[in-house]
Amino acid sequence: MVKAIVDAVDIDPKTGTTLGFYSFGEERPNILILAATEGGSATDVYSSYLIMKHLENLDRIDGSVTILPVANPLAFRLGVKVSPLDSKDLDSVFPGDEQGTITERTAWEIWRRASQADYIIHLKTGRQNCVSHVVAMHREYIHVRNVASQIALPFAIECSGQRGSLTTEAAHEGIPIVSIEMRGDIDQVDSQAAVEVREAILNFMRLKDIISGDKIESSVKLTGRMQHINVDSEGFFVPRIHLGEPVQMGNVIGTIQDKNEVVSPFDGVIVSLSRMNYVFEGDIVARVAPLLVDYRASEPLDSEDSVQPRRKW
C-alpha cells in the first residue's frame, strides 16, 4: 500500500492557517491537486478525500500525486470567499507574496509547489447547480488543451483569464493546469458529483501511466467563455430546461411565475441552471457555454507562441 507523506506548513498558527500537503510517491510526473480555495467547498474537498483513499489502497504509483485538500483553511471554516483578515480572495492573488498578508503568503506557498508540478488540477464547487466541467485556457495554450481534453467530463470551458487566478497564472508559466467545477451546495456534499470527478481524475492518472488500470478515452466538447443569463423582473423562477441541454438564441429556459418567460440570448449548452427559487432583477439564473463547432484537434493555436513560458522556481 502507498503511504502518504504529510507536510504541514504553518502560514499563521494563530488563525489556524496551516496547509497540509499529502504526497503519494516521489517520482515524475507529479500531479498537484488542490481544493477549497474558498468556503462552500464541501463537495470538492470530499472529492479530494476520495482520491486520497483510492491512492492509499494502491500497491504502487509510477510518478507522484500531491494533494492539498483545504487550500484556504479559514475561509473554508467560515464559508466565505474573501478572507476576513485581509479582505482578499485567495484565487486572485497568485503567485502570492512571501512577505505579504496571510492570503498572499498562502498563495505564495501553494505557488512554490505549483511551479514544480507537471500537472495541476484545481477543484471547485459551483455556486449554482451545474454540470461538472473543466475550466481552462484551452484556446490559448496547447499544453492546457491537451490536459483539458483528457479529463473525462462533458465540457471544457474557456476560462475568463483573470490575472491572479491560479488557473491563469500557471498556464502563462507553461504549466498544464485545469480547474474542475462540480455540482454541490454551499454546505452540503453532492456525493455523486464527487465520485464522478474522482473517476475522471483517476482516469487521467491512468492515461499518464501514473497508476494502473483500464483507460477510458475521453470525449470532451470544447467551448468558449461562459455567458450569463439574467432575469429582468422579480419573482419565482421556474426552470423549463435541463442541465447539459443545447439552447439556441430565443429558446425559453424558464419563467418568472405569473409574469414572463426567460429566454436565452445565446446559442450554446446549459452548463449551470438555478433551481426554482425567488429571484430579483439582474440575478443570474443560468450560464451558457458556446460550443466551438469548428474546433479540430490537429489545428495549431494562433497564440501558442505569444507568451514564452517562464518558470520562477
PLM features: residue spans?
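Structured catalytic-domain cores with a bias toward divalent-metal coordination
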Residues: M1-W313
